[in-house]
Amino acid sequence: MVGRSNLSRRRFERLVRRALAALPEEFRSRLENVAVVIEDEPPEDMPDTLGLYEGIPLTERSLADVTLPDVITIFKGPIERTCHTEEDIEDEVRLTVLHEVGHFFGLEEAQLE
């Protein structure tokens, strides 16, 4: 089944929602103004990207900042292609959501590993 998941979009969305709901309340409450979206594929210049945070991390914001809403995008296609089973997909979705939420809170790549 590697790279050939038949996971429906609805099921994938549930996995993302479940990963977000599993976050501790003190983190979830800070994500109210963060849009979490699911796309089938990442941009062509980032074909293996599983997730993407776009915005200004909380640690870099000031009161004077006027920013667009932050966006976390989870890419269904690359996640499915890297996973062997539906359980693997569920685990990868959870890890990817945590990783991108970590960027929102200002964690760097090395801290997220």
Placement of each model-derived feature along the sequence:
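Short alpha-helical catalytic segment bearing the HExxH-like zincin motif
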Residues: 92-100
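Active-site rim/adjacent substrate-binding subdomains
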Residues: 1-92, 104, 110-113
